[in-house]
From Swiss-Prot:
May play an important role in the sperm/egg interaction; released during the acrosome reaction. Its EC number is 3.4.21.-. Expressed in testis. More specifically, abundantly expressed in the haploid round spermatid. Glycans are attached at residue 44. It comes from Mus musculus (Mouse). Disulfide bonds join 94-110, 193-270, 226-249, 260-288. GO terms for molecular function: serine-type endopeptidase activity. Residues 69-313 form the Peptidase S1 domain. The keyword Glycoprotein applies. The active site is at residues 109, 159, 264. Keywords: Cytoplasmic vesicle, Disulfide bond, Glycoprotein, Hydrolase, Protease, Secreted, Serine protease, Signal. InterPro entries: Peptidase_S1_PA, Peptidase_S1_PA_chymotrypsin, Peptidase_S1A, Trypsin_dom, TRYPSIN_HIS, TRYPSIN_SER. The gene is Prss40. This is Serine protease 40.
Length: 365
């Protein structure tokens, strides 16, 4: 997202916002009877995967995490198993979210440099990008479907992209899809939801992107409330950012948490009736420096439910056939490079920067 931060830190925190790593590694109790043991030839270890007989509705959004943890902090290993890292030329540029065995959502603005599938990879099963585990997978992209109306009718409108993976993933406790909400879904007023990503922890000090996945609890607000932070565009004013029906806003009421550069395309998920739904994809925000003065803005996934279903159906004849890369394969060796190469991570490019009512708005990757 444009970088999840708490106080002076993205989803993480440099002060009281920084907490210890959460939750031990354990398998999904909901489907323990449907797990099978598989030997990973790369490191001769045995892991558990979900049997392929489970339907998407049975497995999506099911994790052991059901409660609340306060503040921005490092995310535990199995908390957000749909979280993905989008890689351009081997480097993290954006977040993404798994929604099916071979389908991933992200933000359209992450694909301004290239829309060639072979330029991208999707990393799943990671919390620390420098530390692959036996669950980690690096997937090739077969198809990039950018919404045809992206940025067409209003700034950052239809900021969504659908990626078809070249091969299907095997579900495990570390790799599971989030549920996609239907168009008519009702989210309770002031619902507490969670954003996650590997974006910058601070905008004012450009330290390297964090390797560890960070998370933050944000409160959904109505679009009418959100519009109060972003005045409507006036001809000649140079203002173009506004809140439309295809967007959803979320904020920490203390204004201490925000998305930041590198988080774009990552998920905003809400727990609804026992399952986690991806209600938003990180899109844009005001600058993530203190003080945080406005909500974070996400692409509203339910608005695009039909578009997602139609494109998945029309692409069903494209059969993925390439095996995923395992951490032990050459492509996965040292996926981020050692610490000496941290500076090689692509720095976010300011795609849009406007002064709006003394708020510097930016959409960053």
């Amino acid at each position: 997202m444009c970088g999840i931060r708490a106080k002076k830190s993205g989803l993480g925190g440099y002060g009281a916002g920084l907490l210890a790593a959460l939750l031990g590694v354990s398998f999904l109790s909901q489907h323990a009877q449907t797990a099978e043991h598989v030997t990973n030839a790369a490191n001769n270890t045995t892991i558990q995967i979900m049997k392929s007989t489970l339907s998407l509705s049975e497995v999506c959004g099911k994790t052991k995490f059901q409660g609340k943890i306060y503040g921005g902090q490092i995310a535990g290993a199995e908390r957000w198993p749909w979280q993905a890292s989008l890689r351009l030329y081997g480097r993290h540029i954006c977040g993404a979210v798994l929604i099916d065995k071979n389908w991933v959502l992200s933000a359209a603005h992450c694909f301004q440099r290239s829309q060639e599938p072979s330029d991208y990879h999707v990393m799943l099963g990671y919390t620390d990008l420098n530390s692959p585990t036996r669950y980690s997978r690096t997937m090739s992209v077969q198809k990039v479907i950018v919404h045809k109306d992206y940025n067409r009718f209003h700034t950052q409108g239809s900021d969504i992209v659908l990626l078809q993976l070249r091969s299907s993933v095997e579900y495990s406790s570390h790799i599971l899809p989030a549920c996609v909400p239907e168009e008519n879904i009702k989210i309770p007023k002031e619902k507490a939801c969670w954003a996650s990503g590997w974006g910058y922890l601070r905008e004012d000090v450009r330290i390297p992107l964090p390797n560890e996945l960070y998370e933050a609890e944000l409160i959904i607000m109505s679009n009418d409330q959100c519009k109060g932070f972003f005045p409507p565009p006036v001809p000649g004013s140079g203002r173009s950012y506004y809140i439309y029906d295809d967007m959803v806003c979320a904020a920490d009421y203390d204004m201490s948490k925000s998305i930041c550069a590198g988080d774009s395309g990552g998920p905003l998920v809400c727990l609804l009736e026992g399952s986690w739904y991806v209600v938003g994809l990180t899109s844009w925000s005001s600058t993530c420096e203190e003080p945080i003065v406005s909500p974070s803005v996400f692409a509203r996934v339910s608005y695009f439910d039909k578009w997602i279903k139609d494109n998945k159906k029309s692409s069903s004849n494209s059969k993925p056939g390439e095996s995923p890369h395992h951490p032990g394969s050459p492509e996965n060796e040292n996926p981020e490079g050692d610490n000496k190469n941290q500076g090689a991570v692509i720095k976010p490019t300011v795609c849009t920067a406007l002064l709006l009512s003394q708020i510097l708005l930016q959409q960053l990757i």
